[in-house]
Amino acid sequence: MTDWFARPVLHVRDVEVSLRFYVNRLGFTSPWRYEQDGRARVAQVDRQGCTLILADTWPEKVGKGLIFISVNVEQETREAESAALDALRTELEAKGVPVKEGSWGYRLLVVDDPDGNQLVFNDPAEPAS
């Protein structure tokens, strides 16, 4: 059996602007970028096993992305998982990132990137309040 590895693409207006947001405010790293005519057109960002591609190659799709990112912890207790989401919220808000609470049958943290793509951090083991 082989493993699959997904790299979802988020369509953005300006890859450089998006890179600054994902790296400086969300804590991702960027291992590579593709440049054309002196500007970044596609780039990858990574954080804690999550890999996303940022691309400005399909303008009509800009801002229409929705990505669920599960927050997994080694010690799988409701308290540990809730604490992980709380810590993430504190980290992001300290960097000036607006974070919204949500629910889809379980607790969510929702972050909009500069183009309106949504990153939904979830803890599916925690019931919604």
Predicted feature locations:
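Vicinal oxygen chelate
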Residues: 12-16, 67-118, 123
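Short, charged/polar surface micro-motifs in flexible loops or helix N-caps
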Residues: 48-52, 59-61, 72-76, 85
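Short acidic/glycine-enriched loop/turn segments that link adjacent beta-strands
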Residues: 37-41, 61-63, 104-107
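Core segments of cupin and vicinal oxygen chelate
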Residues: 9-51
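A short acidic/small-residue loop/turn micro-motif
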Residues: 60, 124-128
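Short amphipathic alpha-helical segments
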Residues: 4-8, 63-67
